[in-house]
């Protein structure tokens, strides 16, 4: 009976090892991608968003950095990323905040941590992100009554200052294809800011980005 029990234990451990090796062999590849994105962003103004909606205009920017895919199973990966991105928003002329047309641009470092689910060459991913604003500028267009003004935004406790740290969530999908020795993924993603980034009124980042992700194709 003891001998039989020992044999059963050995068989269980052997089965576990085989399963782990199989998962490792057939899981998604672990890789590092170079990321280049086109980003369209705007602000949601919280309780004032309905009043300002007709004045809002998107700001185009760029995003570049790196994306690490850690394959865990054939259908699931963990994806931490690090990149530099430009966000912001525009209010058209006659808006109730700046009167003249104004544009805010924020220059940030961003770290998303995503869960990615694979379906052949397609995938979907979502997860939280943390961002830090290095600097930014607000430009107010000129008029006969108000001169043009471009100033660097501040990050103190003053009424018109901004907050450096931001948290939010991202969700999107992508498609992977191969070209010669490169693996290329096209990724479309929406970003939803969860924290207010300014002191004087509600401002939450919103953004849509289309990115190209390139890594060396596995043989």
Can you describe what each PLM-predicted range is?
Residues 1-35, 212-218:
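Bacterial Sec-dependent N-terminal signal peptides
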Residues 27, 73-75, 119-122, 178-180, ...:
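Outer-membrane beta-barrel channels and translocator barrels
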Residues 28-70:
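Short glycine/proline- and aromatic-enriched beta-strand/turn motifs that initiate or cap beta-hairpins
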Residues 28-30, 58-62, 105-109, 120, ...:
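Residues that define the transmembrane beta-barrel architecture of outer-membrane proteins
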Residues 34-38, 64-72, 82-84, 111-117, ...:
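Residues on the lipid-exposed face of transmembrane beta-strands in outer-membrane beta-barrel proteins
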Residues 39-43, 85-89, 131-135, 191-195, ...:
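Structural signature of outer-membrane beta-barrel domains
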Residues 43-56, 86-107, 134-165, 198-200, ...:
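Flexible, solvent-exposed loop segments that connect beta-strands
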Residues 157, 166-169, 174-219:
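Predominantly the C-terminal beta-signal and adjacent terminal strand-loop region
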């Amino acid at each position: 009976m003891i001998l039989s029990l020992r044999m059963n234990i050995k068989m269980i451990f052997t089965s576990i090892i085989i399963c782990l090796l199989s998962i490792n062999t057939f899981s998604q590849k672990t890789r590092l991608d170079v990321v280049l994105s086109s980003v369209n962003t705007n602000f949601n103004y919280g309780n004032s968003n309905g009043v300002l909606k007709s004045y809002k205009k998107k700001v185009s920017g760029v995003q570049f950095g790196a994306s690490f895919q850690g394959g865990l199973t054939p259908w699931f990966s963990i994806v931490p990323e690090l990149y530099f991105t430009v966000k912001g928003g525009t209010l058209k002329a006659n808006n109730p905040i700046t009167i003249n047309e104004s544009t805010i641009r924020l220059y940030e470092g961003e770290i998303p941590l995503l869960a990615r689910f694979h379906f052949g060459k397609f995938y979907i991913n979502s997860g939280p992100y943390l961002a830090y604003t290095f600097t930014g500028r607000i430009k107010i267009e000129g008029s006969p009554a108000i001169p043009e003004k471009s100033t660097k935004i501040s990050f103190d406790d003053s009424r018109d200052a901004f907050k450096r740290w931001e948290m939010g969530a991202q969700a999107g999908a992508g498609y992977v294809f191969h070209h010669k020795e490169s693996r290329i993924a096209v990724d479309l993603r929406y970003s939803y800011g969860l924290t207010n980034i300014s002191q004087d009124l509600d401002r939450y980042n919103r953004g849509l980005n289309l990115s190209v992700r390139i890594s060396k194709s596995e043989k």
